[in-house]
Amino acid sequence: AELALSEPERRLLQELNQRGVRYLVVGMSAALLQGARGLTEDIDLWFEDLSDLQIGDAVRAAGGIWASGSFGMRPPAIGGDALEDRFDVVTHCHGLADFIVELESAVSVSVEGVELKLLPLERIVASKRAANRPKDVAAWPALETARAVRRELELNAET
């Protein structure tokens, strides 16, 4: 599966990486990059530390606007004309361990020359099951199929 990035989107992810910001791509965008079928327009980012000032610096370097959510009025958000609303900032992942624990099992992929760390499919499934929203329930079959295919490929690679 491909994830087409605009130049500002690619720049944001590169800036986050170069600045050492620790984040995971989660949700359906991460699942699609691991072979699941489905649709999503958003790229869900789960940051280790939302108070990291480097996040705002990276967003601004990519031409975007960072709303840290630190005033408690609304959740954190990445936006602006260049980045629009493609990125969603995830503040809590249902059914998962702490960020640092999940980061240890992250899947690394390269998308258009940008290294990304993805939440593994089995953890996406766990999170979707725990959240249990209608859109999550609808995604289960595609996620389970992708998980089964991935397991089969791994078994074949071992033999």
Annotate each PLM feature.
Residues A1-T159:
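Compositionally biased terminal segments of proteins
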